[in-house]
């Protein structure tokens, strides 16, 4: 006898709806076969129809408006019985469109819900969208519900049947499983190793109680000397201990390792963190690759634009005469080509002239920047003896290679030492030169004598000259000429003579300006330091107090803003209540007037009837 054929379907329950929602959260809205495997009484098509027709949050379950009713009637005239197309246009399900259309037709025909003519209504395009007859629509005994997917779920019983309990337990187990195959295998291996270790310890304990001592390690020396790749690290190089104490770090590492082992043994390895880290690394790698591609593309485009500009500047237009032209036209075309060539030559000359100007400006700029470089402080090399410029005198005694070396070398000259003494002492001592714009205007300064004024003007002129020569050549100023050495020596001699004739008693010695060095001065300095320290502490305390004041001010401001908001809310509510009271009072007055007028009319009618 063949087994009974079980047809899937039937009324949906709350348990099945919840399982369907949880499965869609995990698997999505495309894996209907996998979702239907959690519901043994439903097929994949029924599961999809239940989601699309009833459970989807995208469904429009609001009341129908007049505009939608008019649109539904017009669309049914255009697309008769094409409920799928009509539902897509109205953003509703086909069952909703069918039921609404049937309701509108019944209302227009005057048919009530309890009439027999209701059974002649329309049906949808398929079994999933037929007007369903659920538990709430008054199914007769023995009738079959053809489309329960679009109707509310049946309430659960107080005691669930065994098959629904099994279905719920299996769904919980499958949907709550977040570990992969590898994590499960690792957990099984870990549990197996733990059980083996516990069994070995139990066996050793029993043997020890019987008087037999058994070690966990083997006694075979050959096997004991073999390397255990599971327990140790092959070719491990332990780093040497450094100057710092790492005992606390090692304790922390051991604690974290033990904590991680306990977490893995209880909960297992979470693959989510590893997957997230791998995804972040892949996204970062992709971003770097895209960034490199963009940089290469930009460089390639820049190089291509430069090459194209260079080629365009070289390229000339090819002007050929049309075929079959006369001699006169040929001469015209020849003249035009000659003029074009001349114009091209002129344009090339202009381009070359502009390039030469740019090169000259760049060369001047480079020269100015090189002139700003300070002279070398540490020169190494041997000082060659002075040799006359006439090489013919000693050519016989020197080889050709020596002559080339001597000609390429820079021989010392007395003029270099003489010139170095003719520049200003500030430059000789490599002291900083002030900027000319920072100097005071001499017109605003009052001088006692004319000599002081001349000295100040000469000082200004010398500063501008040195700054222009050694820092910035574009600054306004006149460079001073080199001084005559004889004149400089004469001035120095005059200064020495005048200094020798001066009275020694009037000259202050340098000893008067030496700072005192004794114990009292040290004590006074220490006292001053203590006073400065105390003042600094007072200032810091004041700063801290000011910060406390600022915090209190911020708190007060927050309280004020909060109170102001509350006051504004209360004021708004008061104004609203006041407006409502005014409107209600006006409405009451109008209603009283209306009622009084009606009472007067009734009184008049009563009087007339009497």
Swiss-Prot record:
Keyword Ribonucleoprotein found: no
Pfam families assigned: Myb_DNA-binding (PF00249)
Gene Ontology cellular component list: cytosol; nucleolar peripheral inclusion body; post-mRNA release spliceosomal complex; Prp19 complex; spliceosomal complex
DNA-binding region: 32-55, 83-105
UniProt-recorded Gene Ontology molecular function terms: DNA binding
Primary location class: cytoplasm
Keyword Coiled coil among record annotations: yes
SS bonds (residue pairs): none
Function of the protein: Involved in pre-mRNA splicing and cell cycle control.
Family to which the UniProt record says this protein belongs: Belongs to the CEF1 family.
Protein name (record): Pre-mRNA-splicing factor CEF1
Species this chain originates from: Candida albicans (strain SC5314 / ATCC MYA-2876) (Yeast)
């Amino acid at each position: 006898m063949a087994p009974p054929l079980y047809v899937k379907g039937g009324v949906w329950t709350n348990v099945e709806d919840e399982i369907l929602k949880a499965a869609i959260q995990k698997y999505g809205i495309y894996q209907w076969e996998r979702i239907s495997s959690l519901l043994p009484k439903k097929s994949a098509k029924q599961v999809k129809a239940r989601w699309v027709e009833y459970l989807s949050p995208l469904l429009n379950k609001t009341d129908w408006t007049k505009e939608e009713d008019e649109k539904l009637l017009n669309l049914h005239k255009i697309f008769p019985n094409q409920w799928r197309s009509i539902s897509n246009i109205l953003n509703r399900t086909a069952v909703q469109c069918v039921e609404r259309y049937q309701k509108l037709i019944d209302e227009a025909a005057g048919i009530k819900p309890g009439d027999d003519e209701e059974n002649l209504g329309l049906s949808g395009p398929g079994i999933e969208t037929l007007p369903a007859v659920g538990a709430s629509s008054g199914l007769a005994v023995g009738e079959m519900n053809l489309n329960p997917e679009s109707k509310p779920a049946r309430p659960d019983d107080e005691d669930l049947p065994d098959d629904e309990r099994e279905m719920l337990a299996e769904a919980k187990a499958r949907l709550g499983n977040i570990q992969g195959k590898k994590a499960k295998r690792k957990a099984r291996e870990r549990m197996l190793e733990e059980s083996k270790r516990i069994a070995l310890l139990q066996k050793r304990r029993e043997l020890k109680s019987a008087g037999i001592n058994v070690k966990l390690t083997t006694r075979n020396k050959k096997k004991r000397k073999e390397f255990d790749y599971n327990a140790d690290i092959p070719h491990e190089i332990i780093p040497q201990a450094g100057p710092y104490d790492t005992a606390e770090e090692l304790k922390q590492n051991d604690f974290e390792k033990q904590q991680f082992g306990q977490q893995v043994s209880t909960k297992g390895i979470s693959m989510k963190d590893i997957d997230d880290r791998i995804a972040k690394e892949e996204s970062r790698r992709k971003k770097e690759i895209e960034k490199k591609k963009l940089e290469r593309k930009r460089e390639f485009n820049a190089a291509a634009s430069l090459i194209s500009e260079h080629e365009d500047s070289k390229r000339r237009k090819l002007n050929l005469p049309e075929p079959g032209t006369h001699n006169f036209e040929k001469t015209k075309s020849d003249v035009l080509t000659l003029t074009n060539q001349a114009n091209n030559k002129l344009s090339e000359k202009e381009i070359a002239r502009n390039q030469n100007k740019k090169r000259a400006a760049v060369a001047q700029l480079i020269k100015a920047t090189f002139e700003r470089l300070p002279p070398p402080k540490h020169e190494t090399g041997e000082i060659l003896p002075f040799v006359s410029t006439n090489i013919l005198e000693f050519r016989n005694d020197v080889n050709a290679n020596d002559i080339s070396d001597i000609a390429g070398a820079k021989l010392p000259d007395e003029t270099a030492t003489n010139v170095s003494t003719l520049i200003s002492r500030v430059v000789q001592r490599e002291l900083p030169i002030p900027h000319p714009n920072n100097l005071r205007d001499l017109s605003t300064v009052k001088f006692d004598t004319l000599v002081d004024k001349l000295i100040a003007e000469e000082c200004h002129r010398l500063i501008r000259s040195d700054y222009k020569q050694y820092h910035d050549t574009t600054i306004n100023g006149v460079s001073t000429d080199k001084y005559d050495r004889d004149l400089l020596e004469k001035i120095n001699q005059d200064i020495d003579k005048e200094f020798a004739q001066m009275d020694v008693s009037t000259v202050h010695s340098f000893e008067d300006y030496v700072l005192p060095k004794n114990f009292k001065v040290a004590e006074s300095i220490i006292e001053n330091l203590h006073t400065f320290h105390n003042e600094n502490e007072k200032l810091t305390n004041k700063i801290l107090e000011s910060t406390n004041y600022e915090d209190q001010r911020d708190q007060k401001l927050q309280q004020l803003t909060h109170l102001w908001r509350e006051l504004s809310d209360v004021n708004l509510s008061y104004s609203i209540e006041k407006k409502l009271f005014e409107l209600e009072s006006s409405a009451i007055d109008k209603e009283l007037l209306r009622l009084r007028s009606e009472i007067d009319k009734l009184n008049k009618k009563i009087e007339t009837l009497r």
